[in-house]
């Protein structure tokens, strides 16, 4: 008969073999939950893996039973993120993204001339849908531009709906007698409005003054307005200093104030000078005198170097200063060499 202690040991081992070992807490599976979740499980107990919201199961099995060995079977189940519909193309815009999987967010922007109609970003939801809905890039348009007072449109080509696209231009012109202040061209901006409008103002000019020793002609109207013109002239032996025609400017004054300048009488009877790049006889070219503003170059002798150089003289309102270095020779002094005939320095 075996000892009592041995009998008890054999009975315990038989109980363990029949009862089996407990299973530990299962290994974590990314993006999943286990029901029920405990520290240990008795042989025969079942657990169920399920993927968290936003994830779907791929491969493997979801339900496991704790075996007598106390070792869970290898779990090949994978929980993969849901994939939202492709959204990588936005007409007339740009999409910035890494992937289209849950829970990623993508952002949107539009090209120049278009605005975002909808949200600037969207998130891939648990259901595999974009939230909020994907936006579109709509063209920026401007309504017809307001027309300033005393102005009209000279260039304007709207769309069929009488609107204009971003970047479109409109050009204004002022009514007669009115001057424009500001840019005559406005542009449809990215904000859906037009750049600053110009202003048209009525402009009047005083009657132009008659210059001394001259005359002025202008329209025989009681009032002279913007863009009206006047012409000036001078009496004999006087020349006009300034433009012959002047215009009433947008600032209410004349574009210029010409005057009449006296011509110069020459005391020199005989000399060769340079006028407008050519050698001329002053007694022939300017026998009636030099007009205001005309300029000549006189020849002078350099005594030490025995060569010639030139100095300028200009008629200024009836006065001309002859260079001191110039020496006029009498026609009888035929033996003297004129400075104009000496080699240049």
UniProtKB/Swiss-Prot annotation:
- Which residues are in the Sushi domain? 21-81, 82-139, 140-202, 203-262
Q: What's this chain's function?
A: Binds to various kinds of negatively charged substances such as heparin, phospholipids, and dextran sulfate. May prevent activation of the intrinsic blood coagulation cascade by binding to phospholipids on the surface of damaged cells.
Q: Which UniProt keywords apply?
A: Disulfide bond, Glycoprotein, Heparin-binding, Repeat, Secreted, Signal, Sushi
MF terms in GO: heparin binding
Chief place where the protein resides:
secreted
Q: Name one Pfam family in it.
A: Sushi_2
What PANTHER family does its record include? COMPLEMENT C2, SUSHI DOMAIN-CONTAINING PROTEIN
Q: Could you tell me which residues belong to the region Sushi-like?
A: 263-345
What is the tissue localization of expression for this protein? Expressed by the liver and secreted in plasma.
> Where is this protein found?
Secreted
UniProt source species: Bos taurus
Give the sugar-modified residues.
33, 92, 162, 183, 193, 253
Name the PROSITE patterns for this protein. SUSHI (PS50923)
Q: Tell me the first and last residues of the signal peptide.
A: 1-19
GO CC field: extracellular region
Q: Which domain of life is it from?
A: Eukaryota
Asked if the record carries the keyword Signal, the reply is yes
Cystine pairings recorded for this chain: 23-66, 51-79, 84-124, 110-137, 142-188, 174-200, 205-248, 234-260, 264-315, 300-325, 307-345
Q: What is this protein called?
A: Beta-2-glycoprotein 1
Q: Does the keyword RNA-binding apply?
A: no
């Amino acid at each position: 008969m075996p000892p009592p202690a041995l009998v008890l040991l054999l009975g315990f081992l038989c109980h363990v073999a029949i009862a089996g070992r407990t299973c530990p807490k299962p290994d974590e599976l990314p993006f999943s939950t286990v029901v029920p979740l405990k520290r240990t499980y008795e042989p025969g107990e079942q657990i169920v893996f399920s993927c968290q919201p936003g994830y779907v199961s791929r491969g493997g099995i979801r339900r496991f039973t704790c075996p007598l060995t106390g070792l869970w079977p290898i779990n090949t189940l994978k929980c993969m993120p849901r994939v939202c519909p492709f959204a990588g193309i936005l007409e007339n815009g740009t999409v910035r993204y890494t992937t289209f999987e849950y829970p990623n967010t993508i952002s949107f922007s539009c090209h120049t001339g278009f605005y975002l109609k909808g949200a600037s970003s969207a998130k891939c939801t648990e259901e595999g849908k974009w939230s909020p809905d994907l936006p579109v890039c709509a063209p920026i348009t401007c309504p017809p531009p307001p027309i300033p007072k005393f102005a009209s449109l000279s260039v304007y080509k709207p769309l069929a709906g009488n609107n204009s696209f971003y970047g479109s231009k409109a050009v204004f012109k002022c009514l007669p007698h009115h001057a424009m202040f500001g840019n005559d061209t406005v542009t449809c901006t990215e904000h859906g409005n037009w750049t600053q409008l110009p202003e048209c103002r009525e402009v009047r000019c005083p009657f132009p003054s008659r210059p001394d020793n001259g005359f002025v002609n202008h329209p025989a109207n009681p009032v002279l307005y913007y863009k009206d013109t006047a012409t000036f002239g001078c009496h004999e032996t006087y020349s006009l200093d300034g433009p012959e025609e002047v215009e009433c400017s947008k600032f209410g004054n004349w574009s210029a104030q010409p005057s009449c300048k006296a011509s110069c009488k020459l005391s020199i009877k005989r000399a060769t000078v340079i006028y407008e790049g050519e050698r001329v006889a002053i007694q022939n070219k300017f026998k009636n005198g030099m007009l205001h503003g005309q300029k000549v170059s006189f020849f002078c002798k350099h005594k030490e170097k025995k060569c010639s150089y030139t100095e300028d003289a200009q008629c200024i309102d009836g006065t001309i200063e002859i260079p001191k270095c110039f020496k006029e020779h009498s026609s009888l002094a035929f033996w003297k060499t004129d400075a104009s005939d000496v080699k240049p320095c």
